[in-house]
Every structure is written in structure tokens, then in C-alpha cells.
Amino acid sequence: MVGMGFPALLLPVLLSHVAASPRAAVATAHPAASEAAAGVLRAGGNAADAAVAAAFALAVVEPMSSGIGGGGLALVYVAREDRVHALDFREVAPAASRPDMFLRDGAPVNSLSRCGGLSVAVPGAVKGYAEMARRFGTRPLADLVEPAARLAERGVPVGRKYHLAARDALPCLRQDAEAARLFLVPVGADAGARPGTGGGGDGSAPAPRGPAAEGARVPPDPGWRLVQRDLARTLRTLGRDPEAFYRGPLARRIAAAARARGGVLSAEDLAAYRTRQRDPLWGSYRGHRVASFPPPSAGGAILIGLLQALEAGGPARAWRDEAFLHAFVEIEKRLFARRAGAFGDPDHAPGAAAAAREMTSPELAARLRAEVGERATPSAAVEPPPAPGHTTHVSVVDAEGNAVALTATVNLQFGSGIVVPGTGILLNDEMDDFDAAPGTANAFGLEGTGANLPAPGKRPLSSMSPTMVFGGDGRLLLALGSPGGSTIPSTVAWGVLNVVDHGMPLDQALGTPRIHHQWKPDVVVVEPFGLDAATRRALEARGHVLQDGAAPFGNPQAVRVDPATGWREAASEPRDEGRPAVP
């Protein structure tokens, strides 16, 4: 059999990214966030409490990926009800938004939607976290915010991931004095200061020394301590009153910061923000029920449609079988083409809900599988139907069987690059998830046909796919999700396939290199060590164009419940910085 090369050197690393307990477990993208959640569980909190604590902590330790100036989506499983709730706290477009707001002389200007004031959508994270704690949790919000506030106050040493993100976002961060002071260090300062030695004021580097220090700021080296005292104060304020983010002096400061950089966000936009309760999307895969997020995410529909179409091809193939990989790519290509059609905010795009139902139907699964031939279909021959990140993830299962899969984001690395002075709040650049014009691509290369244009109060389309898998007996098996923009459905699908079809240990299921295709560009993205030479040749012989990724895409976090013992096994992507924890 032609298969996939898997370096033996990776196996010992996998073993350090798993934790198990008979009671509860949590997996997040950062050890400090996992420990914050585990601490809440130890203190008697439930899965919702732990997820909220982890989300606030991630806002501190991974500001490039998520924060209280962003938004997200979450599935919450309440065991006593045997019900999955879908909470939408996605950002929305300000009331002054227009379909052509990112066009100049009729052409899209990408920088307008990816950095600065116009890129800022109305944040939903604080309202979403507060609602989750109120509806599903057991602890006061102030208790859930406190671990994050302490991390912000004391500071956290940054890792290589932070350094690389700051390097990528450097031009944007340098445009905002507050963001540059908080997240960068002066040229000539000790950018690699030992933890605890850096940090003047609210997280800036040590005072400059010498003439060379007068230049522009640069990304700190791993080990530098990020201190965010303003954010600590803001978090404690929100713990007492989360509505302070949306009304009053703090809301006016948030709006003023965006408008000072050319944005249209207003205090009235913040006051008008509301979360949405959605109905989860449901599908099936080899005797398991799969729940994921509906529009305004297209990720859940792509994930379920992909799994069901693969099952329609017959019994599970051998691990990394070349014919299976070919089918995976061909089906995913077609699903992403359908995404470009009617998908958008269901409150503004009437066809979005129907498109999601069709994409997750058994009939479409059979049709897509039947369309897979022996050779690759060029993307140009796969048309969308007529139209009518950088992110982070938390998975938790508690002792009562409650579970949360929560994905949160500020969109691109460090969002808009705008920090609200005196608050530590980094604002999102979620407006780039809209289409600047029909047929134009966003930062992830995704195109649309008109249903996802900006409009007042509209939620941008997303790929976030918080997911839960239930066994044939109805019991929870898996809670998982991932960041990664357009690659999220692929990442989550590989996690499900590796657990359900191949019975892999959870850490190996998440750490096995992945492939991805999103219709346009017409390439198969392959992670490092993703395919052996024989498999590459076989796929290329079918007409696929392979593109080697420089690094793994996605950063999945999952908790699995052992059907036989009930033990909770948590795992983090072993090639990243996350670590799971147990109470």
C-alpha cells in the first residue's frame, strides 16, 4: 500500500501532549490557559465555567489569536438535557458599513480590511463569554476572569509562536503607538530578556539604552515577558459588569480608538450588539452522530458534508490510502466551491440555512462521491451553485458529562493592530472575512459570489467548526475544534477520521500531518512530512498539484471520552505550544 511517511522522531513528542482523568479534562492552545480551566474545575466549576476561564486566559497569553476585542462560536453540551446548544458571538459589521467600503476606484484594497480602523467589526467575545457563564455555568463571572487578570498583571513569557506572529504583523502593529508599545520592543533593547526582567510600564520593553534604541520597535524574542496591566484592570471591570464593554465610558473609548484610525465603529454599534442562539448542524459518520456549527460558519457544513461523502464511498480505507486521499481532495474541492455560493449570515442571506442543509444531506453526499473519478477535476470545472486565522480553540468535558467546544478569534495575527489606549483591548480585523466584492479573495484565499458582502449588523462568514461526536449509543465521544482559517474543516475532519476509522490515540490523531484543498487556489496543501514519495507520485499522476506547506496548519484541541471506562483524555496538537490539563 502506498502510504504516508511518519517520522519516528515525532512519536516521543506526541506523548507529552496528552492528559487523562476519570473526572474531567481540558485542552487549549496554551498551557497557562489549560491550567486556568483546570483550576476552575478543581474549585467545583463545570465545563462552561472552565471554557470561559480558558477563553479569557487565551486572550492574555495568545493576544495574536483571540481576545476580548474579537468573537467566536461555541457548542455547549448539557448532559442533563442531552442537548447541544450553539452560541454565536461572532462579530458584526458596524451600522455605517457598505458593500463597497473596501473598494477604491472599483478595485479591492486589501489593506483596508486587514489593518486599521475600517477592519474592525463589533466585538462579541465579552457578551458571549458572559452569556455562556450565566446560562450554562455555576460560578460568578468575576471568578472566571480572575486567572486571566492575574496572568496579565504578572506577565507571561512569550514563545516562538508569538515571535513569528509579531513578525508577520509587524507593519500593522507599527502603525498603532499603543499596540507597538505593548507587543513590540525598541530596537536596541534586550529583546530576549529573561522572563521577569523585561517590561516597563504596561508590558513595554526595558527603557531604551543608547542611540540605536530610538528606531522602530521589533518583535521580542522568545522568553520576553509580556505584561498587560491595563488589560488586567479591564478584565476585572468586566468580571463585575460585562455590559461595561458595550455601554458607557469604556464603550466610547473602544469606538473612539477605531474611528481615530479611520473606522466607522460607534458606541451605538456596541450597545446594539446581541449574541445569537443557533440550531446545531447534525450529520452522521459510520454510526456516529456529528454536531457542528451552522451559518454564519460554513466550516461545520463542509466538515459534515465531507465526512458523509467519504462514508458514501464504502468501508474505511487503510490509513492514508492514496485512493482515499484523492477522494478527500475531490470532495473537499466541491464543498468549498459550494461555500462560495449562498453561504453568509443567515439573518441577512436567506439562502444560507438552506445551503447548509443541502450540504449536509445524504443525497448530496452520494452525488459528490459519485462525481469522484480517477483523475483530479480542475477547480475551473467546479463552479459554485447560483447565489440566492488565526484563531484559537478550547475543548472541555467535565465530571457530569457536560462539554464545550469553543473557537474564538481576532481573525488575522493581532487583528486590526489597534489597542484601545489605557485598556489593553486589542481590536479584531474581522471585516476581512467579508467579501470585498464578488469573486475576490480574502486573506485566506476564499472567494464568494455576493451573499457575504458587508452590510450593517451583518456577521461575516466563518470557517470555525467547533464539533462534537456522539457514539451509536448517544453518549459523547469527542469534543474538538481548531484554528486555521479556511483549513479548519480539514483539520477537524482528519481528527474525526483518525479516531473513528483508525482508532488512533488522541494525540496521534491530532498530530498526524494533514492535507487540504479549498477549491481556489487549485492546489493540495501538504503539511511537512505529510506524504511519502510514492503517495505524492500517485496523486500527481491523477492530476493533483501538490504544494508543500512551510508549517503545520491548524492547532486542534480535543477531549475524548473512553466508551468503556468513561475516562476523559485530552490532547493538544503536538507540533504546537498547547498542553492539556486535568483537575
Segments from the language model and where they lie:
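Noncatalytic scaffold domains of N-terminal-nucleophile
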Residues: 17-35, 39, 47-240, 245-247, ...
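Active-site rim segments in enzyme catalytic domains, especially the processed small/beta chain
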Residues: 60-67, 71-86, 103, 264-266, ...
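Internal maturation/activation junctions in enzymes
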Residues: 187, 209, 314-410, 422-423, ...
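Short, small/polar residue-rich loop motifs at catalytic or cofactor-binding pockets
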Residues: 277, 388-391, 413, 462-464, ...
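Glycine-rich phosphate/pyrophosphate-binding beta-alpha loops
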Residues: 291-300, 391, 395, 407-418, ...
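Extended C-terminal subregions enriched in glycine
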Residues: 345, 458-459, 492, 501-551
